[in-house]
Amino acid sequence: ETGGRVEVLESDDKNAAYTGPLTILVDRFSASASEIFAAAMQDYGRGLVIGQQTYGKGSVQNLYPLDRYALGQDPGYGQLTVTIGMYYRVTGDSTQNRGVMPDLTLPSAISTDEVGESSRDGSLPWNRIRSSDFRREGAFTPLLPELQQEHDARIAGDPDFQFAVSEISALEKMRTEKSVSLNLAKRKAEREARAQEQLARENARRQTLGEPVLKAATEIKDPPDAILGEAAEITADLSQLEPKFLARASGTDKGT
């Protein structure tokens, strides 16, 4: 807090609500409370964080109505937002500015250069304090190479996922454009060219799936959420690998 006091937040309930395989899907818009949860699951080895680097909102604010201190019936001065504290992980690291880094990375259309605390001028820097005394419930590090291998093999043959990647690449290309033509005919031609490129990507996806191709870009509908689908596949992989790893670690694996 602002006075330098460290308050450790604890739970009186020592029982686990769920003990099965757990993944936490995050992206650059995951901020504040969702970052605290993801970081806690990661630090305790309780859950696998997948997706994109999170927002990096690790500060605590309070609102102070300025009208309370003003004279007059209806001054209308608004309110002041004051930072009064910071959140820290049990490791002592802050989530401020850096956010939470995923254990397995998935592509995202959200630019980390444009969204997040680190992209804002004057944002509070990352820092750390002394670690808390805590006990890890598990460790996913030994499973990551096999999970990554399964993920890479699966997405290589997933038309929906590859379509999502191509859409993200097209969006990133548009972000790099530093000028816009003021000529109306040229602008329309550029827009039509992008529509045709999107139609080509969609039809490539459809052909791979054995679906009929479309004739116009206006016929394109939102495809399945490939990122969410792959997150579910990774969770399924984890549910298969985690018991085997625990059995090997405890010496109870009989090779079956």
Q: For each predicted feature, which ranges?
A:
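C-terminal "post-core" interaction segments
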Residues: 1-256
